[in-house]
Amino acid sequence: MAAGKEIRGKIKSVENTKKITKAMEMVAASKMRKAQERMRAARPYADKIRNITANLSRATPEYHHPFVVKNSGSGVVGMIIVTTDKGLCGGMNTNVLRLVTNKMRELDAAGTKVQAVAIGNKGLGFLNRIGAKVVSQATQLGDTPHLDKLIGPVKVLLDLYAEGKLDAVYICYTRFLNTMKQEPQVEQLLPLSDERLSQSAAEQQSHGWDYIYEPDAQAVIDNLMVRYAEALIYQSVAENMASEQSARMVAMKAATDNAGSLIGELKLVYNKTRQAAITKELSEIVSGAAAVG
């Protein structure tokens, strides 16, 4: 029963794989919950700093920070591409990088060059393969994104925009919608949206809040605009990490379920093979007994 022994070996191998994927599914589920908590915890800060920034902008209409000024003429844009460091998360990276590719083709057709910042090994590898200009990178962020690890790489593009050397800065990441659904996004980071700031200013005005700024509103807004842009980037990275763990959990669950189905099929084949071998042996015994008799 050499065939039966081989099938038993395959069953054992698939069972071991199933144990691994099940463990990875459980780990991803735990990390997903923590990533969602971090993502939600970052939102109030981003909302509050946007409201204060909007209030400042309304209070100083004569001053326009470089981040809200629309640049033109450089023929260069920046792209912050957020992906994962590890794989085994379904088509998440593939989907966002496909969106990045389409955006780059659109910009190239318009004669616009791209300077990229890669956050995550998968995006960095992709950019290197296509020969894109990578001005900075941040990899091996771990399961918890720290702003101090992101500030250095992204500050390169923020400074270039403030100096008027970039026409726009885009951020590409995977937005977390729910456990089963994540959506790749390409959003304009700079110049900051006038519509979003105007809406926040209207909300502030409806509350009737006012502030006294020291040393002056312009000095405060210079600092807050940078913090606001950094908060938006951090929020995108946090959403990407929540999406990663959700996609990995779903992928590992699918792998575990597929392993279970394969084990069932292999056991059926094994039983049929064993039954055929027993039937053959019985036939040989009966034939031998008949020949002797």
Swiss-Prot record:
Record-linked Pfam families: ATP-synt
Keywords: ATP synthesis, Cell inner membrane, Cell membrane, CF(1), Hydrogen ion transport, Ion transport, Membrane, Transport
CDD domains, sorted: F1-ATPase_gamma (cd12151)
Topology class, membrane: Peripheral membrane protein
Compartments, as annotated in UniProt: Cell inner membrane
One Gene Ontology cellular component: proton-transporting ATP synthase complex
Annotated GO biological process: proton motive force-driven plasma membrane ATP synthesis
Tree of life domain: Bacteria
Main location: membrane
MF terms (GO), sorted A to Z: ATP binding; proton-transporting ATP synthase activity, rotational mechanism
Subunit structure: F-type ATPases have 2 components, CF(1) - the catalytic core - and CF(0) - the membrane proton channel. CF(1) has five subunits: alpha(3), beta(3), gamma(1), delta(1), epsilon(1). CF(0) has three main subunits: a, b and c.
Annotated PANTHER family: ATP SYNTHASE GAMMA CHAIN (PTHR11693), ATP SYNTHASE SUBUNIT GAMMA, MITOCHONDRIAL (PTHR11693:SF22)
Known role: Produces ATP from ADP in the presence of a proton gradient across the membrane. The gamma chain is believed to be important in regulating ATPase activity and the flow of protons through the CF(0) complex.
Family: Belongs to the ATPase gamma chain family.
HAMAP family: ATP_synth_gamma_bact
Name of the protein in question: ATP synthase gamma chain
Provenance organism: Leptothrix cholodnii (strain ATCC 51168 / LMG 8142 / SP-6)
